[in-house]
């Protein structure tokens, strides 16, 4: 399974075990406490799927306070050298063949039509080879909220989905 995966940064044992458990799953939740390396595990998971030729695009939806931190984290932890990283409101997404393409977006943007439109275009074109990562998934705990509905609808056709949180959800969005 992941035993031949070459990490760029050495994982702690709990991170290695988390990757082993979730690596091949279509849908998986990384429920790990704050500061235990959920982001690194998710990046390794995306890179492993890319190396298996299962994905070429990753959408990261994260709170405004952290979504741009993903740029530094991807560069720090990704063993894939051919990266194309785009952040919503900074870069427009331009797919690069032969690269692992990352698109980072603030979760708040998905409460608005403009943010939804950007992700619709990406998901329509790359859904069969795409992974969606929802960082701090508790931001969609209310299934009747517009943002939650938009994220669930956009994620439906995507092949691989991951949610990350250090806090359990009080209301299930499903």
Q: Whereabouts are the PLM-identified features?
A:
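SF2 helicase/translocase NTPase motor core
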Residues: 1-30, 35-148, 153-157
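Conserved phosphate-coupling serine/threonine residues in phosphotransfer and NTP-handling enzymes
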Residues: 165
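Active-site segment of extracytoplasmic enzymes that catalyze sulfate/phosphate-ester chemistry
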Residues: 168
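Short aromatic/hydrophobic "clamp" motif used to bind/position activated sugar donors
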Residues: 161
